[in-house]
């Protein structure tokens, strides 16, 4: 993905600390206090321009949402949507997924969304894939006992890799859809990428994976 540089993006993000949390480490274990509601916490990793997370937040006011995006030039579009909507149950982080355990306490998150993650197709880049075992270990820590991962992609190879990686780690595949838009699922919220790829006729793959039983220390 080629990113359009927006030199002003960081300054705009910094101007809205009520939406893009500047010090997420200080909220670890206390996100429900920040939101002001004791509701389930759902996290989207790679929130992009924010269409998915803002629409989900509108549909589910009884859930608190956090969108994580590494690139300021992309996150600023999600910020614009959040400012316009005025949603109180969404916060954003300009952060790296490698730092998840610094932001969230063990068992604090109920669900993780991985929507159209970079597939990093070259073998030498395997460790960068968001379903590589090192990332799964982070998800395992922050997810609640009955927490789960919802994944969508149009990349068949990445999907197959993810199914194997999740299974080998111990996640239970509760749902696997090889053609989401022909599956009859009625409550699917599409991302920007999903709209683009499905319009081209690309098949969309989806799975739900439940975290393994908590390992005893």
From Swiss-Prot:
InterPro entries: SAM-dependent_MTases_sf, tRNA_(Gua-N-7)_MeTrfase_Trmb, tRNA_methyltr_TrmB_bact. GO terms for cellular component: tRNA methyltransferase complex. Substrate binds at residues 122, 154, 191-194. It comes from the Bacteria. Residues 124-129 are annotated as: Interaction with RNA. It catalyses: guanosine(46) in tRNA + S-adenosyl-L-methionine = N(7)-methylguanosine(46) in tRNA + S-adenosyl-L-homocysteine. Its EC number is 2.1.1.33. Pfam families: Methyltransf_4 (PF02390). SUPFAM superfamilies: S-adenosyl-L-methionine-dependent methyltransferases. Keywords: Methyltransferase, S-adenosyl-L-methionine, Transferase, tRNA processing. Gene3D superfamilies: Vaccinia Virus protein VP39. The active site is at 118. S-adenosyl-L-methionine binds at residues 44, 69, 96, 118. It is an enzyme of class 2 (transferase). Catalyzes the formation of N(7)-methylguanine at position 46 (m7G46) in tRNA. Belongs to the class I-like SAM-binding methyltransferase superfamily. TrmB family. PANTHER family: 3-DEOXY-D-MANNO-OCTULOSONIC-ACID TRANSFERASE/TRNA GUANINE-N 7 - -METHYLTRANSFERASE, PENTACOTRIPEPTIDE-REPEAT REGION OF PRORP DOMAIN-CONTAINING PROTEIN. This is tRNA (guanine-N(7)-)-methyltransferase. It comes from Geobacillus kaustophilus (strain HTA426). The gene is trmB.
């Amino acid at each position: 993905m080629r990113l359009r540089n927006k030199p002003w993006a960081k300054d705009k993000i910094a101007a809205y600390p009520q939406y893009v949390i500047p010090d997420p480490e200080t909220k670890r274990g206390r996100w429900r206090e920040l939101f002001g509601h004791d509701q389930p916490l759902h996290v989207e990793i790679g929130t992009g321009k924010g269409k998915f997370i803002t629409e989900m937040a509108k549909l589910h006011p009884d859930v608190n949402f956090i969108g994580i995006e590494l690139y300021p030039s992309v996150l600023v579009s999600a910020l614009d949507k959040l400012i316009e909507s005025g949603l109180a149950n969404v916060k954003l982080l300009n952060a790296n997924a490698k730092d998840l355990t610094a932001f969230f306490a063990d068992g604090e998150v109920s669900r993780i969304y991985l929507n159209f993650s970079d597939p990093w197709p070259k073998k030498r880049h395997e460790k960068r894939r968001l379903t590589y075992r090192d990332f799964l270990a982070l998800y395992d820590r922050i997810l609640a006992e009955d927490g789960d991962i919802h994944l969508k992609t149009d990349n068949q190879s990445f999907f197959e890799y993810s199914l194997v990686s999740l299974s080998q780690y111990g996640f239970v595949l509760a749902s696997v859809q090889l053609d989401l838009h022909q599956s009859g699922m009625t409550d699917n919220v599409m991302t920007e990428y999903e709209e683009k790829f499905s319009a081209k006729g690309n098949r969309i793959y989806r799975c739900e994976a439940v975290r393994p039983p908590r390992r005893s220390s």
